[in-house]
Each structure stands twice: as C-alpha cells, then as structure tokens.
Amino acid sequence: MSWRPVTVIKYWYVGGHRDNFPQVVTSKYPIENVRRIVGQAPDSIVSHGAGWARIVKNGRPVNIVTLHTWPQAYAFQAVDRDASKAEHGGDRYRRMEIEYICSHTIATQSDAGQQLWMMMGDFNSRSRRDNRVYNYPDDDTRLLVHDYIAEHTPYVDVIAEKHPGEFHTTTHGQSRIDFVYCTQPLCERITRAEVIADDFTEPVRDPGKLSNFYHPSDHRPILVDFDMK
C-alpha cells in the first residue's frame, strides 16, 4: 500500500451571500478578504453573492473571485415570471450581475492584466466560444455574460484556451456553464486544466426524481493545476 501526502487545509473563506448558496475558498495559505459582494437594492442585487479573496504565494498576490449567478430564466424578484421569461429576463439579469461583479473586482485595478487573477464558479450562462455546439443566433441573450467578460476584461477562458476546438460539458446534459477564468500571467502558469468526467463525477438523477437533483452533483468539477514557483 502506498500513501500520498495530504495537504492540510488551514484557512477558509466564505464570499458574500444573501441565501444558502455561498461560495467557499479553502487554502493552506492565509486568505485575505478583499470584498464580499452582494450588490445593491433595488436593481443591482447579486442574487447568490460573490467574493474577492486574496492569497500570497512566493511573494506574489493571487486574486480569487468566486461567483454563482442567478439560475432562472426569469429575472430575480420578477413579479410576472412568465413575462420576464419571455423577455429573457434571466439572461439579462445575469449580464447585470457579471458587470457588477467585474466592476467591483478586476476593473478596480488599472494593470489587472499584468496581475494574477482568477474568476470561477457556476455562471449559468453559455459561451460564444462553444456556439458551434449550441448554434444560437449571434444576438442570443444566452451569450451575454461571457461576451461581457471577453469584451471588457483581460480574463482568459481556461478550458477553451487549453482545449481548443473541443467541447467539455460541465453538466448532466450538453452545457458548459461552469468556468475558470485567469489573466494571462496566471494562465501561463497552468500545468493542467480539465473538466473531470469519470464514473464518480457522472451526474446520476436522484431515484426520487427530485427536481434537478443529481448525485453526486448536477455539475462536474473543473481541475486546474498551477506551477507557482
């Protein structure tokens, strides 16, 4: 029997959240809370919150942004959900959320493109880089979130960059809605990046057929390794 060394997790961080869906960062290095993000009422609420944490590795700050955008087809707090859905309210709400999150994190740094930044989570949105699979119209609102990131930030889509021309679903269906983004200086340190698809991570529908409930999860994990020397 062989044994592998175990990394002891000494530090943890919970981002801003308004409900029971926070994001958590664990680390063997001390974590600084830079900002917990929940948005502003009445029209800029970040539904599940977001966080901006920072660690220092070998003397270099690493900025970590976590998020989980609004999941529904209608807008958050929509009074008439059917009408909101017909107007693509959910897509437009997620577009507002990502602009709010980016403007309060990476956009606060004029030289962010030369710094070490990552942003990750369940975006509940599809990317134009995968549109050869989806075949959506060019102006489809389902592409708004990642269009904003591509047009207004220095972030690089890690999975798309490391697996050009390939499609890797992150759900039980054929949807890539979970992403890891990095700025180029951090992207250059990546040694491995993949969506983990195996017998354990395969989403299996709950026997009780609970709505949208899968074991072990309705999302597949994304693994990204970095050489931070």
Region spans (language model):
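Soluble or luminal CAZymes and related metallo-dependent hydrolases
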Residues: I45-H48, G89-C102, D140-T141, P216
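Short amphipathic alpha-helical segments and helix-helix/interface helices
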Residues: S2-R4, Q23, I98, C102-A107, ...
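Structured beta-strand-rich core segments of catalytic domains in phosphoester-bond hydrolases
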Residues: M1-Q72
